[in-house]
Amino acid sequence: MSDDMSMGSPSSAGEQGVLRSMQEVAMSSQEASKMLRTYNIAWWGNNYYDVNELGHISVCPDPDVPEARVDLAKLVKAREAQGQRLPALFCFPQILQHRLRSINAAFKRARESYGYNGDYFLVYPIKVNQHRRVIESLIHSGEPLGLEAGSKAELMAVLAHAGMTRSVIVCNGYKDREYIRLALIGEKMGHKVYLVIEKMSEIAIVLEEAERLNVVPRLGVRARLASQGSGKWQSSGGEKSKFGLAATQVLQLVETLRDAGRLDSLQLLHFHLGSQMANIRDIATGVRESARFYVELHKLGVNIQCFDVGGGLGVDYEGTRSQSDCSVNYGLNEYANNIIWAIGDACEEHGLPHPTVITESGRAVTAHHTVLVSNIIGVERNEYTDPTAPAEDAPRALQNLWETWQEMHKPGTRRSLREWLHDSQMDLHDIHIGYSSGAFSLQERAWAEQLYLSMCHEVQKQLDPQNRAHRPIIDELQERMADKMYVNFSLFQSMPDAWGIDQLFPVLPLEGLDQVPERRAVLLDITCDSDGAIDHYIDGDGIATTMPMPEYDPENPPMLGFFMVGAYQEILGNMHNLFGDTEAVDVFVFPDGSVEVELSDEGDTVADMLQYVQLDPKTLLTHFRDQVKQTDLDDALQQQFLEEFEAGLYGYTYLEDE
């Protein structure tokens, strides 16, 4: 069950694409090749994102049609010239369709390789991203596709689109009587709707409503496994998971249905190991355990026809091909092989039919298709000047700093870089304490801090990244000396998982990528919250607390792209500081080089956000008008202030250029 997309010989289209990507950039310059390795684009980009000969990010929504690609930096600038506001989501629906085709193809290969007789369906759980562009792009792809709902609202959306798929509907989550009736209505209309029993209290309502509607229910059972994945999302699986029935409850459900004469309604077995499974071994272990449930249920006379392995198919946000929380150590082929072979082996061993396999692979379908693009509105850089000696009567701590600086430049000195750094840190600490007590002036503090920065810069130049003993010092200095970039976006609205669970997303400039990334930066959002900062960045095969950056003009910094934000982020985003949804555009790229762009979301206005918190914009305008009229300002100025207030109410919630 080896995966030809993993880290062996480059025999697969995926890995050949990675090598081709590296070679193309290497032809332009060695610097670009180094940059490509620094940001790991060749791996997390998955052939959808690359760097062109100009050092710009390019997008190829369908790697099977490599000539259909667009320069993202040029596209954003062209859109800005036409009035596009930033931040904005640039969405590529064609990537969604390619992801769906790729997953279906992987399972087709796995089934053919094993000789597996059952079907396969990818069922898209719309909770991952319920936006219309996502659902409609997938159902119009021409590929087999089912839909999954986890709430009444989601089920209504699924039922409304079900006529376009004529496939499978899976109903998960907590269910009240109305939810259950909706699902049964869908079954009555001719759809194949599986009501998955996750709590024993649900089955009585299902049987009651099925009788009232005169419909035979199509049921599933979610089994709670002992197997569990690891990482940030592990609590959604295992024995302590929020959903599912324990072994004794599964037996109780079987007997309840047998007594009601509805045992034949139980047709689907469902389990869920967790989201973003990093280690293929955890997936294989869980599928083998769940296959035992399939065997045992058949022994009890339950004719299970569908085997729903739930979610778990991860994506490599880091590009490290590892077991870390935001990466995966497997590819699509290996994932499909492990599932098909584990289920197939259990069936062959016990002489059972091969069931239809279902996966609920939402993240793997949607993550790549969306890029958040924003502008940098301010930069704070540490600049280095030639230090000057302190006054002869300067306090001892200032003299110590200066003496350390001089010693650093003497040839043949035997003190270590670490010792210089520690001495300067202690002296600076004494100066900060002394400043608080009045022993040092503001000018003396500023002089000491500037000299300390110069010393850090000098130490940094002499450190070797290949020396493991130097790595902690390098990390410390990079964090201390990194540029602060203030970016026009809300982390809480656009990348809530980066804040809430410390998830890593690829972030890099859209241009200037033909240069060596010699600077370091940290990214801060525009909310009034110290948590509004990105803490971790891709740095080669590792993760760093600062972002590598090519040299740039601080007066005209590059636009930034936040990649792989297509799963969950739009839906989970919150309204901290009343920053709302960003604008969103759908981008379609064609083989002849043409590009079509459609505005799919105008973004929230200030008025929209105020209404969310029950503040009526018209009432606010009236109150403001009353205040203005009570001033002694002249009529023209009053009118100007009123117009500005009203324009602000119906303007973008993010910062806008004049």
Swiss-Prot record:
Pathway(s) where this gene product acts: Amine and polyamine biosynthesis; agmatine biosynthesis; agmatine from L-arginine: step 1/1
Keyword entries, A-Z: Decarboxylase, Lyase, Magnesium, Metal-binding, Polyamine biosynthesis, Putrescine biosynthesis, Pyridoxal phosphate, Spermidine biosynthesis
Record CDD domains: PLPDE_III_ADC (cd06830)
Residue numbers bearing the N6-(pyridoxal phosphate)lysine modification: K127
Reactions that this protein is recorded to catalyse: L-arginine + H(+) = agmatine + CO2
Names of required cofactors: Mg(2+); pyridoxal 5'-phosphate
PANTHER family the UniProt entry points to: ARGININE DECARBOXYLASE (PTHR43295), BIOSYNTHETIC ARGININE DECARBOXYLASE (PTHR43295:SF9)
HAMAP family tied to this protein: SpeA
UniProt record similarity statement: Belongs to the Orn/Lys/Arg decarboxylase class-II family. SpeA subfamily.
Protein name: Biosynthetic arginine decarboxylase
Function statement: Catalyzes the biosynthesis of agmatine from arginine.
Organism in which the protein naturally occurs: Salmonella typhimurium (strain LT2 / SGSC1412 / ATCC 700720)
